[in-house]
From Swiss-Prot:
Induction of its expression: Not induced by aluminum.
GO CC annotation, single: chloroplast membrane
Top-level lineage group: Eukaryota
Tissue: Ubiquitous.
Disruption phenotype: No reduction in aluminum tolerance.
TM annotation in the entry: 109-129, 147-167, 209-229, 250-270, 280-300, 308-328, 353-373, 389-411, 426-446, 466-486, 495-515, 523-543
Lineage: Eukaryota, Viridiplantae, Streptophyta, Embryophyta, Tracheophyta
Compartments (UniProt record): Plastid, Chloroplast membrane
Organism: Arabidopsis thaliana
PANTHER family hit by this protein: PROTEIN DETOXIFICATION 44, CHLOROPLASTIC-RELATED (PTHR42893), PROTEIN DETOXIFICATION 45, CHLOROPLASTIC (PTHR42893:SF45)
One Pfam family here: MatE
Alphabetically ordered keywords of this record: Chloroplast, Membrane, Plastid, Transit peptide, Transmembrane, Transmembrane helix, Transport
Name of protein: Protein DETOXIFICATION 45, chloroplastic
Length: 560
């Protein structure tokens, strides 16, 4: 969903120490170049290489592929020939800079995207399986579960996406600070290179994220359980509706898993801060495989219906959270010795803009579901099928956006604007190709896919009308997600939040009135408008000459 967008910390890159007095500056402890310092730059700054022990940008480079699998901290090593390393760096006016350019942007992007795609695909695919199993129970069950899922996602993800993004950034910054401190200590004592974080560390960012996740999860569970009736009525499901009882039962049971769900998302952000994307994928795979195994057992074998589906999901969520906590406990101390070491203020401040943006997205999607529910049982069931397929496929492009975001954040923190331009251009091209490919595949197979979710002829008839919405909008959706990732990589959170509020307001207003004359098609047109306006807003920001993307309109020579 929206998928969550990941912000990589803007810490100063660690680097290889050299056997040359010319290329061995003393790294100042805790020196970093956050993205916020370059976000509103209007012109490039020139810098030269000199022997000043306190240069503006210490002359440091990063060894290729030398990462610690345990925590993602760069390992330092010796270079036999500092002069040969100088040749590998780009030049500024004939002088080597301290910015190491990626050897192969395309390969690096692909390697980052593969685990991200796997992680993004697991939850939506499991949700598709759940929808398919529930759909075989009947249209009433499918429609009621669809409304309850929308409510659960709206409430639970309201704070989850900001928490995930901010946790990633803060954890990465904490790791970089500790590594810099260790390096400074070693420089004053010996020539033995740092090996990252070999032992458990106390990271306030990790502890704060976990405490916030637990508190938010408990609050969400209570809110969803105690206010299930009002939430359903707000979505258009009245007490006399045949969908009310199964929808309320499903929502109350799913609420029990809210704490685990929030904690697991926060843990994913923490592991990404450690630059470890494999561990979350393994844990998500185990938990979701368990859910897929339990769905038919509880729904059909034990004849629990939608309640069985909800219980299966709750068991899966707690399994994922527990596995991640066990593995994280091997790396860091989970809870701080004193409450004063937690930094709630930093989290709340940094997550404010992301929260506003997330709220705008969720409100728009909630309006769409609410207006679809008002069209009747068959229309709501068809809308649920279209939405699940659309979200599951479009989230795959979100993984590409997250990978591009990571590369952009890394290059921008080093003021490597040529690298940012290269990543941006390549990611946008891949986004267009991916969107067109998905549109073709879905256009040819969507009718067959719909049959997996329901056998009701009336539901299938309505679903076939949604082919244009699901398939044709894929190129637009792909670019909308990618633009979000690009702006997050440049830490352009204010624009991301404000533009989303405007886009969401326009789309929601359209969907509130269009269904009166267009029916369910009015909802789908409104959602297509939502993604189209997001794409336009993202592209417009890229074209601003005085914004954070000023360098996109500057020649390579001027950047140099």
């Amino acid at each position: 969903m929206e998928s969550s967008r990941v912000v990589v910390g803007g810490g100063l890159p660690l680097a290889n120490r050299r056997n040359s007095s010319f290329a061995k500056p003393k790294i100042q402890q805790g020196t970093f170049l956050p993205l916020s310092r370059i976000n509103n730059v209007s012109a490039p700054q020139k810098c030269s290489l000199h022997t000043n022990p306190n240069p503006m940008f210490p002359f440091v480079t990063r060894r290729k592929s030398q990462t610690n699998p345990d925590c993602g901290v760069v390992k330092l090593g010796e270079e036999d020939d500092s002069c040969s390393s100088l040749d590998k760096l780009p030049e500024v006016n004939g002088v080597h800079t301290g910015v190491a350019r990626p050897v192969d942007i395309k390969r690096e992007l692909v390697m980052l995207s593969l685990p991200a795609i796997a992680g993004q695909a697991i939850d939506p695919l499991t949700l598709l399986m759940e929808t398919a199993y529930i759909g075989r129970l009947g249209s009433v069950e499918l429609g009621s579960a669809g409304v309850s899922m929308a409510i659960f996602n709206t409430i639970s993800k309201l704070f989850n996406i900001p928490l995930l993004s901010v946790a990633t950034s803060f954890v990465a910054e904490d790791i970089a600070k500790i590594a810099a401190q260790d390096l400074a200590s070693e420089d004053s004592q010996s020539d033995i290179p740092s090996q990252g974080l070999p032992e458990r560390k106390q990271l306030s960012s990790v502890s704060t994220a976990l405490v916030l996740a637990i508190g938010i999860g408990i609050f969400e569970a209570l809110a969803l359980s105690l206010a299930s009736g009002p939430f359903l009525r707000l979505m258009g499901i009245q007490s006399m509706s045949e969908m009310f009882i199964p929808a309320r039962q499903f929502l109350v049971l799913r609420a029990l898993g809210a704490p685990a769900y929030v904690v697991s998302l926060a843990l994913q952000g923490i592991f990404r801060g450690f630059k470890d994307t494999k561990t979350p994928v393994y844990c998500l795979g185990i938990g979701n495989f368990l859910a897929v195994f339990l769905f038919p057992l509880f729904i059909y074998k034990f004849r629990m219906g939608v309640a069985g589906a909800a219980i299966s999901s709750v068991i899966s969520q707690y399994t994922v959270a527990i596995l991640m906590l066990i593995l994280l406990n091997k790396r860091v101390i989970l809870l701080p010795p004193k409450i004063g070491s937690l930094k709630f203020g930093d989290y709340l401040k940094s997550g404010g803009f992301v929260l506003g943006r997330t709220l705008s997205v969720l409100v728009t999607m909630t309006v769409a579901t609410s207006m679809a529910a008002r069209q009747g049982v068959f229309a709501m069931a068809a809308h649920q099928i279209c939405m699940q397929v659309w979200l599951a496929v479009s989230l795959l492009t979100d993984a590409l956006a997250s990978s591009g975001q990571a590369l952009i954040a890394s290059s921008a923190s080093k003021r490597d604007f040529e690298g940012v331009k290269e990543v941006t251009t390549f990611v946008l091209k891949i986004g267009v190709v991916t969107g067109i490919a998905l549109a073709i595949v879905l256009g040819m197979s969507f009718s067959s896919i719909a049959g997996l979710f329901s056998k009701d002829p009336e539901v299938l008839r309505i679903v076939r009308k949604g082919v244009l919405f699901v398939a044709a909008t894929q190129p637009i959706t792909a670019l909308a997600f990618i633009f979000d990732g690009l702006h997050y990589g440049m830490s352009d959170f204010p624009y991301a939040a404000c533009s989303m509020m405007v886009v969401g307001g326009i789309s929601s207003a359209f969907m509130l009135y269009a269904p009166a004359g267009l029916g369910l098609s009015g909802v789908w047109v409104g959602l297509s408008m939502f993604m189209g306006l997001r794409m336009v807003a993202g592209f417009s920001r890229l074209m601003w000459r005085k914004g954070p993307w000023w360098f996109m309109h500057t020649s390579d020579k001027r950047l140099a």
